[in-house]
Amino acid sequence: MASKKAAMVMMAMIVIMAMLVDTSVAIDLCGMSQDELNECKPAVSKENPTSPSQPCCTALQHADFACLCGYKNSPWLGSFGVDPELASALPKQCGLANAPTC
């Protein structure tokens, strides 16, 4: 249990560092690249969310939903301005038939 928590904290730190440093650092989280995650950010933002873009919906087609659902209750989402409820609704908004319920 402790090692799983430590791994999640480490992954969150990597994501934070990648978002803070505007470089060509390649990051892959739950089958989505940093660029793909950024495509979806406007649709899951706490302030002024938008409808998901076509590039966001395309990226979600190959995402690992079980992995993404694992972050739903993560306190790190709030620090990125991500609303977990909006994020959970995103696959349905994109019309993805294989979208799980987190």
UniProtKB/Swiss-Prot annotation:
Zn(2+) binds at E36, H62. Keywords: Apoplast, Cell junction, Disulfide bond, Endoplasmic reticulum, Lipid transport, Lipid-binding, Metal-binding, Plant defense, Secreted, Signal, Transport, Zinc. SUPFAM superfamilies: Bifunctional inhibitor/lipid-transfer protein/seed storage 2S albumin. Binds 1 zinc ion per subunit. Its main location: secreted. PANTHER family: LIPID BINDING PROTEIN-RELATED, LIPID-TRANSFER PROTEIN DIR1-RELATED. Belongs to the A9/FIL1 family. This is Putative lipid-transfer protein DIR1. The lineage of its organism: Eukaryota, Viridiplantae, Streptophyta, Embryophyta, Tracheophyta.
